[in-house]
């Protein structure tokens, strides 16, 4: 049984029950506000800010997680391999004192960093700037010598001018019932995704060609798990070592069941513990009543290192995308810098 502490998503968002009439009314108001805001930026009524280097924005249209951060980390790694010096801009959701801009290091206290920026800094070793104003974060990164800015989330942050937009779509939930907030999960209408340069479908069937049923700039991404890393020391174990065993599986992410399912597919007996997205852990959260290994996502692990023991393991995600996707992305970047 799950601990039942995961964040609650309205059942009508994903079609289990009809949308309440009042929410349909609120959706109309929200839709008008979204359209007016986008028009204000298009017409120049609200100012936009750019920087002198390419800006890549990775985001989604729905509220909640879709796999943006693992893709951000993989893109940053590929950029480094290609000789770029990327910097990462993020809002830093859930951190203390959220209006204060801050540089995030791998050892920045989690309550000051936010879990996703902390994980990005830990995994990439690159400069990470958190700021509610992504354009200010981008300027700070460029001032520190970054020659490309990758924005983790921020598709709706039109204040920051961008060169490449990548929409990430949940391969299972897609756009839910297709309604805008609060009647559905959409932050913007579905047609907004067609304006993005690339659309990445998380957890779709892998293919080395564009995704069937989408468009020529739509690609399928798979997330793989194959080992667990001890939070104390450098001990690494294959997930096969846990096959046939019971473990406490911990996930404080938007869709914890996805993580639990991935572990089950590896033959692991999962005792699930779902926590709210962005939950800040205490040692008391792990009083499970039985001494079993604890497997958790990397996003959770960065918040548990201070009190973890030898039984705590993080499970890294490995991103797989078609070779043609990377070729298309880097071709676009080369054209940008050669202009």
Curated annotation (Swiss-Prot):
What Pfam families does the record tag this protein with?
A: LpxK
Q: Does the keyword Lipid biosynthesis apply?
A: yes
Q: Do the record's keywords include ATP-binding? A: yes
Under catalytic activity, the entry for this protein gives: a lipid A disaccharide + ATP = a lipid IVA + ADP + H(+)
- The highest taxon in the source lineage is Bacteria
Task: Describe which pathway this protein belongs to, using the record's wording.
Answer: Glycolipid biosynthesis; lipid IV(A) biosynthesis; lipid IV(A) from (3R)-3-hydroxytetradecanoyl-[acyl-carrier-protein] and UDP-N-acetyl-alpha-D-glucosamine: step 6/6
Q: Which InterPro entries match?
A: LpxK, P-loop_NTPase
Q: Which GO terms describe its biological process?
A: lipid A biosynthetic process; lipopolysaccharide core region biosynthetic process
Q: Which GO molecular function entries does the Swiss-Prot or TrEMBL record give?
A: ATP binding; tetraacyldisaccharide 4'-kinase activity
This protein's UniProt keywords: ATP-binding, Kinase, Lipid A biosynthesis, Lipid biosynthesis, Lipid metabolism, Nucleotide-binding, Transferase
GO cellular component terms, semicolon-separated:
plasma membrane
EC numbers for this chain: 2.7.1.130
Give a short account of what the protein does: Transfers the gamma-phosphate of ATP to the 4'-position of a tetraacyldisaccharide 1-phosphate intermediate (termed DS-1-P) to form tetraacyldisaccharide 1,4'-bis-phosphate (lipid IVA).
Q: Which family does it belong to?
A: Belongs to the LpxK family.
Q: What is this protein called?
A: Tetraacyldisaccharide 4'-kinase
Q: What lineage is on file?
A: Bacteria, Pseudomonadati, Pseudomonadota, Gammaproteobacteria, Lysobacterales
